[in-house]
Structure formats: structure tokens, C-alpha cells
Curated annotation (Swiss-Prot):
Protein name from the UniProt record: Tachykinin-1
Source organism per UniProt: Schistocerca gregaria (Desert locust)
Source lineage: Eukaryota, Metazoa, Ecdysozoa, Arthropoda, Hexapoda
Compartments it resides in: Secreted
Residues modified as Arginine amide: R14
Superkingdom, taxonomy of origin: Eukaryota
Tissue: Midgut.
Length: 14
């Protein structure tokens, strides 16, 4: 899910 666009490597994959 794209919750945090600031950290797409971690939050982007979740």
C-alpha cells in the first residue's frame, strides 16, 4: 500500500 510516499522502499511495499 502507498501509505508513505516518503519511504516507498518500506511503506510502499506494505
Amino acid at each position: 500500500g502507498n501509505t508513505k510516499k516518503a519511504v516507498p522502499g518500506f511503506y510502499g511495499t506494505r
